[in-house]
Regions:
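Alpha-solenoid helical repeat scaffolds
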Residues: 1-336
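Leucine-rich solenoid repeat scaffolds
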Residues: 338-345
Length: 346
């Protein structure tokens, strides 16, 4: 007879309070198949129901530390254990201890480490999850979910070296995962590795398909525009911003930076004003965007209107920016408020 049905019979006995009959059936199955995972787990349930806690733990270890038991089965058992633990409103120490015992063994499959990491994150134990997630991506470099969790933890800590460390192998493992290129570009930008940023963005754009979200493509071109500007390659910067806005005409960051850099060069001011106005409409309390718009109006000679927008910028924390404060002084001076200008030029 199929041993699976024997175990189910034992489970029915156990559910109906026939503990001895259940025990006898489980023992019979285990005598024939000592590594039968269903029988081992049911035997653990028997020990739990009969209050034999030590034997219950031993039986769980027999199952979860058994190399002959498949990772799928172990994951299924651990999921059931987690559900039972939550339903009984117990703390997480027992589950964590169980995972730790399993993790002491050499893992050759990512399923258990991934489940453990997800459990730790559900318990707000982010720091503890990081080494477990690192083990997951070592075992399965194509596990993008685990890699994104590692990136998320590094972003929270503003650890850009860690982001680079996590993203570089991610790109090698899954070259079409554009999110890794994006975070890598941001991290290189923070590290002031400008050539690396341009290289990463260019490589990302090689993997664009018909299904790629246009906003994502726009962001890569926008980053390239920012980098070309820092390198004083203005023609390339403006071309990149143009491309960015082709893919997403509402890319606020690209609109603002493009408009501001045009105003600094005192060129295409009508185009700059049009772009900047879109950012102010989208985020009317953003001091950076208000300042850009005010400065474009200033460069066009619309001093009274410029003052309205620079005042708004100052009301929205603009006084924390030296650039905005200096612009404020310049605009006040050109509206005839010399005293106000001197106050801001200090």
């Amino acid at each position: 007879m199929d041993m699976r049905y024997q175990v189910i019979l034992g489970d029915v006995y156990l559910q109906n309070g026939k503990k001895q009959e259940a025990y006898d059936v489980y023992q019979k199955v285990l005598a024939a198949e000592p590594d039968n995972p269903m029988a081992i787990f049911s035997m653990a349930s028997y020990y739990k129901q009969t209050g034999q806690e030590e034997l219950y733990q031993q039986q769980l270890d027999t199952l979860l530390l058994n190399k002959k038991v498949t990772p799928d089965t172990k994951v299924g058992v651990m999921r059931q254990m987690i559900v039972e633990n939550e339903q009984a409103d117990k703390d997480s120490t027992q589950i964590i201890a169980l995972f730790d015992r399993i993790m002491k063994q050499e893992q050759d499959d990512p399923q258990i480490p991934m489940l453990y990491a997800q459990y730790l994150l559900s318990k707000k134990m982010e720091a503890e999850s990081v080494p477990v997630l690192e083990q997951v991506v070592d075992l399965d470099p194509t596990n993008n979910a685990a890699r994104m969790m590692l990136i998320g933890a590094a972003v929270k800590k503003e650890d850009y070296k860690q982001i680079i460390k996590v993203c570089e192998p991610g790109i090698e493992a899954t070259p079409d995962a554009l999110e890794f290129y994006y975070y890598l570009a941001i991290a290189y930008h923070q590290a002031e590795q400008t050539d690396s940023v341009l290289s990463v963005c260019s490589r990302a754009l090689e993997h664009v398909t018909a299904d790629t979200r246009k906003e994502v493509i726009s962001d890569f071109y926008s980053i390239m525009g920012d980098i070309y500007h820092t390198k004083k390659q203005m023609a390339e910067a403006y071309a990149a911003y143009d491309s960015s806005l082709v893919y997403n005409p509402s890319n606020i960051g690209a609109l603002n930076n493009y408009a501001y850099y045009l105003s600094v060069e005192r060129r295409d001011l009508d185009k700059a004003e049009e772009m900047s106005y879109k950012t102010v409409k989208a985020e009317p309390n953003n001091s950076t965007y208000l300042d850009t718009y005010a400065w474009i109006l200033f460069e066009k000679g619309n001093y009274a209107e410029a003052r309205i927008y620079i005042d708004n910028a100052m009301k929205n924390d603009g006084e924390k920016s030296d650039v905005i404060v200096e612009h404020c002084g310049d605009i006040y001076f050109m509206t005839g408020d010399v005293e106000g200008a001197l106050k801001y030029w200090k």
